[in-house]
Amino acid sequence: MIQQQTYLNVADNSGARKLMCLRVLGTGNCRYGEIGDKIVAVVKDALPNMPIKRSDIVTAVIVRTRQPVNRASGMSIRFDDNAAVIINADGNPRGTRVFGPVARELRDKSYTKIVSLAPEVL
């Protein structure tokens, strides 16, 4: 469950390290974002000499949440942190690598490029 003011780790090599969620996109009246939802966020911490700077407004996709995700098979999965991958207007990741595992739900939401870059899909 990602809502406004939630801090997230960045799971790619775009140059940002921490994001703060400003708005969850595409959820209508619902306040919370789940895995695979797009968010608008501000960069709170970034590496020096990288294209993404601190206080930039970016669009990202949630790839991991601490809140358990219940699947149709009855299994639930949760991660150790809240993390997102920064994307461009086309929905492709801005970085060239993805760090850490990502959830299988991203494949269902047609983020196949992020899934293919991830080292592990749970």
Curated annotation (Swiss-Prot):
Coiled coil: none annotated. GO terms for cellular component: cytosolic large ribosomal subunit. The keyword Hydrolase does not apply. The keyword rRNA-binding applies. Keywords: Ribonucleoprotein, Ribosomal protein, RNA-binding, rRNA-binding. PROSITE patterns: RIBOSOMAL_L14. One of its GO terms (molecular function) is large ribosomal subunit rRNA binding. HAMAP family: Ribosomal_uL14. Binds to 23S rRNA. Forms part of two intersubunit bridges in the 70S ribosome. Belongs to the universal ribosomal protein uL14 family. Part of the 50S ribosomal subunit. Forms a cluster with proteins L3 and L19. In the 70S ribosome, L14 and L19 interact and together make contacts with the 16S rRNA in bridges B5 and B8. This is Large ribosomal subunit protein uL14. It comes from Crocosphaera subtropica (strain ATCC 51142 / BH68).
